[in-house]
Amino acid sequence: RYETRIEASYDLIWEMREPGGVDWSADWPSEFGISYESLAPKMPDGLCVNSYNRNGQKSSRHLPPKGGIVEMSPGMNSLLMYNDDTEFIIFDDLNNSVSAKATTRSRSRASYTGNTLDPASKGEPEKTVSPPDPLFGHYIEAYEQLAIPIPETLNATLRPLVFSYLIRYEFTHGTEYIGLA
């Protein structure tokens, strides 16, 4: 049997700290009005494992988020893994592990008819977007699938490829010109 047990874990982080940068997790101001932990992505609902054999043939398996058994072609395979619960992420060219791409749609929710508090909008549609779906990924360029009676365990840590952003504005004057965001 040509099977491997995938054991997946996820880096559920939302902040990539630069060397010497601020450690926001240790010094998060309460005046931000939101907790540091609430910005972290949630555990995904599923895992997609794409295996590509040496001839470039692709096989996809949909598993629970922590993994499971994957059947692969014997010999060398490339593996591309990502969370299987993305609603607004578009995957392209997954038939080739080298050229696979993921992107968000240009607009992911319907426009609304303008800000009712702003007379200048005159009911004109305003382009808005939903926050991007969390996307986690892991890639293994070469994995040798052996014929063994008990599946070998392959640990994979999926890292975030899409992040949340917290944007804060602080005003010293002109607050009377600010509408509801």
Question: Where do the model's predicted regions map?
Answer:
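Extended low-complexity, serine/threonine- and proline-enriched intrinsically disordered segments
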Residues: G21-Q57, E176-A181
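Short, low-hydrophobicity acidic/polar segments
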Residues: C48-P160
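Bacterial Sec-dependent N-terminal signal peptides
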Residues: R1-R17
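Residue-level signal for secondary-structure boundary sites
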Residues: W14-M16, I89, T175
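Short helix-loop boundary/capping segments
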Residues: S164-A181
